[in-house]
């Protein structure tokens, strides 16, 4: 897809190996991929915005055509226009994701008809992985190895060490 620029967005609270799979696959399809980290106004964040951006940046650092951009507030289509993005990239794990994305795509297309949306299906073994499930595991200090990038594991270990000291 020469000349095509993608934008993959999320709250990444925290970034998971499911997200990373989407980002890596998109990096092979697009000349450049921006990963936009947003706050979800409907959710209470587990990690701070800055920490989520840091973990995500560390996780994608080996991908030369991927750039993390912070957009704490606003719409993905506004960021897409600002970055001259040609495609919004969305990941689908299941039919619930699909149903949600249909409504989102309708409004994205109304707001930015020149920006296409493409969907990537989650790899089968990563379909159950979600940030909310990872947060549950973290809260119970259950192992998250194999489910998240090393940057997240490092941060969780650091948090656990700090909690032991307090």
From Swiss-Prot:
The record marks 19 as: Transition state stabilizer. ATP binds at residues 11-12, 19, 91-93, 101, 126-132. Pathway: Cofactor biosynthesis; coenzyme A biosynthesis; CoA from (R)-pantothenate: step 4/5. Its main location: cytoplasm. It is an enzyme of class 2 (transferase). It holds the Pfam family CTP_transf_like. One of its GO terms (molecular function) is pantetheine-phosphate adenylyltransferase activity. GO terms for biological process: coenzyme A biosynthetic process. Keywords: ATP-binding, Coenzyme A biosynthesis, Cytoplasm, Magnesium, Nucleotide-binding, Nucleotidyltransferase, Transferase. GO terms for cellular component: cytoplasm. The keyword Metal-binding does not apply. Homohexamer. This is Phosphopantetheine adenylyltransferase. It comes from Streptococcus equi subsp. equi (strain 4047). The gene is coaD.
